[in-house]
Amino acid sequence: MPHIKLFIPGPTEVRPEILDAQAAWMIGHRMPECTELISSIRPKLRQVFQTEQQVLISASTGSGLMEAAIRNCVGKKVLNCVNGAFSERWHEIVVGNAKDNEVLAVEWGQPILPEQVTERLASGEFDAICLTHNETSTGVTNPIPELVQAVRQSPNGDQIMILVDAVSSLAGADIRFDEWDLDVLLTSTQKAFALPPGLAFAAVSNRAMEKAKTIPDRGWYFDFLTLEKYLLKDQTPSTTVVSLMYALDKQLDDILAEGLEARFARHLAMRDRTIEWGKAHGFEVFAAAGYESPTVTCFANNLHIDISGLNKFLRTRGMIMSNGYGSKLKNVTFRIAHMGDLQMSDMEELFAAMDEYLAENLD
């Protein structure tokens, strides 16, 4: 199969060196070699999450750890903050786990604002809140530090579990778990980590670990306490994705060698260039001004281009970008990912190909 360079918001482009790292000889997950591998990974993960607390490792998707966060941290009632398809998934998971909840919904393309959270938490009946840092469907980054401040200042705010989905932003955006006072911050490998899918990670606060001890029916596979028990021994409760763990170890080395500050700056520069390109052609940014994602830009299809036709053309040039997500935004928007290990030269290659298509197909 020919290589198609991915400018989609996951799975993302994976470098050959990372693919090669998976080709190491197989080992058993209870062998000392696997323990050594996990021991190498753990401190580097904490650096990327910017935390001194635990970062759990799960052989699952990010959605799996979203479910884990709900099962381990919600005892009374949870507020689901929805401004797109993936924040809506928080609500679906909450309902699927029969947790009492309310929804704070805003127009897609808009951020969740602190005053909205303050108003909804005023009743004092919530013990958790679900937030999405980077709404992949709309290209909106929610103002998490300001939202945390609103939560902590609400009734019983110091006891409210702040659960944050950073699946499409962590390792591409500056997210400070300890400094921001979060309780669960989760992500997975196939987005800004620029790895194949198959692993997910969650930084979990000491406060959240204590809360989990009070929650019945946490299950087993996604039980934070079980995951932590094995993690402290540099092990996993069940067979992990060993080949992907090799790739993770290599990629963490490379991420830290680049430097987190430099990595975040590269993502912002690619974001700014993408917006510049789109505006030069007359496309409107779908995200509200000031809340544009550093990892994926969503454009309104206000010029009514044939997005499927554009992607068909891009495939002839060895690349692909993304249509709008789901029935609500498909063909109404399109998305260009600029995350992971993509470089500015990759973006320019994409824009040159898109320029070629638009020159022939725009009236």
Where is each model-derived feature located?
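A glycine-/small-polar-enriched, mobile loop at the entrance of the PLP active site in fold-type I
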Residues: 2-57
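Active-site phosphate-binding strand-loop segment of PLP-dependent enzymes
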Residues: 112-171
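PLP-dependent enzyme catalytic core of the Aspartate aminotransferase-like
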Residues: 1, 332-363
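Conserved PLP-binding catalytic core of the aspartate aminotransferase-like
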Residues: 284-314
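Conserved active-site segment immediately N-terminal to the catalytic lysine
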Residues: 178-190
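Conserved beta-loop-alpha segment that forms the PLP phosphate-binding cup at the N-terminus of a helix
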Residues: 52-79, 83, 87-91
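Active-site C-terminal subdomain of aminotransferase-like
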Residues: 13-14, 190-276
